[in-house]
Amino acid sequence: DEVLTSLLNLCTPLEPFDMPLLDAHGATLSEDIYAGERLVMKSGSRIRSTQIGLAASIGLDHLPTRPHPRVVVISAGPDLVEPGLNLTGDEEYETNSWLLTTAVRETGAVAYRVHSIPENEDQLKDAIEDQLVRADLVIISGERHDDSFDLITRTLKQLGEITEVEIAIDSSGRHNFGTIGPDKVPVVTLPGDPIAAYISFELLVRPMIRTMLGASTIHRPSVKARLEKGLSSTSGVRSYIRGVLSEDGKSVTPLGSQDEQATLSDANAFIAVPEGDADVAAGAEVTVVVLERRYI
């Protein structure tokens, strides 16, 4: 919670401006909209097709919006290889920039994936500095085994003020955050492991982007559900177990093989297990973070 608070302190809603109706689709409304004296759209809501139609029906051709934040996503490390190429030795396919770029877009921001993979400090510094002109937020991650985390941290400390943090989440990996460049652009380093990176994105980075959007809610919705199958987690830290929430939202089933990346694509929810609950029995009521809105 302290880390999230620090991250949110780096973010402020972007300055609003009027956008043509079609361009406003997917943005966040920055003012209440009235038809005469009747409130028809609330500030902070996401502008969807139905809001576009409503605006047109009351004679509006523009809407006051918060712009989409521009988020730059970079992966760095000498062992990373682009998908489609052959692997040798200790190399691994670069996964996180693809995962995180699309996750950023799903959150409502504009995402820029840096196509080159920096292998040393000079290359990474050049890549970051080249991107700052179009960045409201920078996300960086490294290799699955996190050996490149030190490379990333050293480079970022040349560019700004960086804080390294440990997060009390099971298998969370290494993180840092801060501001870089003359405009003090927020930056977050996520773990190299794709599962850990995605969980951290959902819990930490998504709320940052939603704050920049000026959204009325910055967190995923959560519900209480009955656990269909017992589970075990690491005592002393929070765990977010990938699971499948039932269509009616009343029960949730944890997926097997939690160390496999396939659980990310198979899950529609995280089962949030508090620090003190190492084992949770079937039938217990648990808190479920809903990842797909159609399930609530």
Residue ranges and their predicted role:
Residues 36, 43, 59-65, 128-129, ...:
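A generic local secondary-structure boundary/capping motif
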Residues 1, 65-190, 194-199:
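Helix-rich terminal scaffold detector
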Residues 17, 21-22, 26, 31, ...:
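Flexible glycine/proline-rich
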Residues 31-38, 74, 142-143, 147, ...:
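Structured N-terminal alpha/beta-domain signature
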Residues 50, 123, 222:
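Short, conserved clusters of charged catalytic residues that mark active-site
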Residues 1-118, 254, 270, 287-296:
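Short, glycine/charged-enriched hinge/interface segments at domain edges or termini
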